[in-house]
């Protein structure tokens, strides 16, 4: 069943789940005008911190960083090959006159303030940039983060399951990436697919199996949240990870983006 969350009350009712949903209206207290996608692609492919994959494996994740295969290629040549790019932290390109100038002030701070105002805390919250070339896919996998996915431009199809627990029990979801392989013989009616276009937002739950097709060139932002808690409580799936490991796995992962740091800066 497709779901769209439009109010904060609905978000609070649905954030602790394993079935993805779209987000609109009051849940998104920000907007931003990004540079043309061509400019973003040309800049990111030249950045040393950018990683890349071919985007050809659908049933499992690409495991190898192939960015060096794409460096030096023209935009036109990139459009003729199979590529996806990932830049790890948008704020590193947020300086006066830079590619994402103003992003922190206009997007990241309002989003963090919204979470804080409604009882959330977190161990990490940062934004990364993604570009998918035409006719590519982000392979089947499960993230160790709660992710707000902002599809800024282009068309994607975000696939998951209507009943993730049936196909991928939590014990299996916490296995390493190499073991995350799409189940066989999944009936079409068990697949939950969202067609997403320009300026569309989707909440992708931690440990939710998913895979994403990009029929055309797309650019988007992922807000990654680790240790996300509402009124002090983790979502049940992240609590499972903590219990399994016996410790908090987020402590050393971007600690400068933790809510205690953000709250101090927003006073």
Feature annotation, model-predicted:
Residues 1-36, 43:
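Fe(II)/2-oxoglutarate
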Residues 10, 115-117, 136-141:
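Catalytic micro-motifs at enzyme active sites that drive phosphoryl/nucleotidyl and oxygen chemistry
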Residues 27, 36-125:
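Signature of the catalytic double-stranded beta-helix
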Residues 33, 138-143, 148-150, 159, ...:
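Short histidine-centered beta-strand/loop micro-motifs
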Residues 128-142, 160-165:
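Conserved short histidine dyad/triad with adjacent acidic residue
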Residues 151-210, 227, 238:
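Double-stranded beta-helix
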Residues 173, 215-225:
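Short, compositionally biased
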Residues 192-196, 200, 223, 227-267:
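Conserved double-stranded beta-helix
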């Amino acid at each position: 069943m497709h779901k769209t969350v439009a109010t904060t009350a609905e978000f609070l009712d649905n954030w602790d789940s394993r079935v993805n949903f779209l987000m609109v209206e009051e849940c998104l207290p920000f907007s931003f005008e990004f540079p043309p996608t061509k400019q973003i692609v040309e800049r990111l492919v030249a950045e040393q911190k950018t990683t890349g994959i071919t985007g050809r494996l659908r049933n499992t994740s690409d495991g190898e960083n192939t960015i060096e295969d794409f460096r030096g290629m023209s935009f036109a040549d990139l459009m003729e090959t199979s590529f996806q790019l990932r830049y790890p932290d948008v704020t590193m390109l947020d300086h006066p006159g830079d590619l994402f100038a103003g992003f922190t002030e206009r997007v990241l701070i309002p989003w963090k303030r919204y979470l804080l105002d409604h009882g959330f805390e977190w161990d990490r919250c940062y934004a990364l940039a993604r570009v998918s070339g035409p006719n590519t896919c982000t392979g089947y996998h499960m993230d160790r983060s709660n992710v707000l996915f902002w599809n800024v431009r282009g068309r994607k199809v975000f696939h998951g399951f209507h009943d993730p627990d049936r196909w991928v029990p939590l014990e299996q979801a916490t296995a390493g990436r190499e073991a995350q392989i799409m189940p066989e013989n999944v009936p079409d009616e068990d697949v939950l697919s969202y067609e997403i276009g320009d300026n569309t937002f989707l909440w992708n739950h931690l440990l939710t199996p998913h895979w994403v097709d990009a029929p055309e060139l797309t650019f988007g932002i992922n807000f990654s949240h680790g240790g996300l808690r509402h009124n002090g409580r983790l979502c049940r799936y992240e609590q499972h990870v903590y219990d399994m490991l016996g410790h908090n796995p987020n402590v050393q992962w971007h600690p400068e983006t933790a809510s205690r740091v953000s709250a101090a800066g927003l006073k």
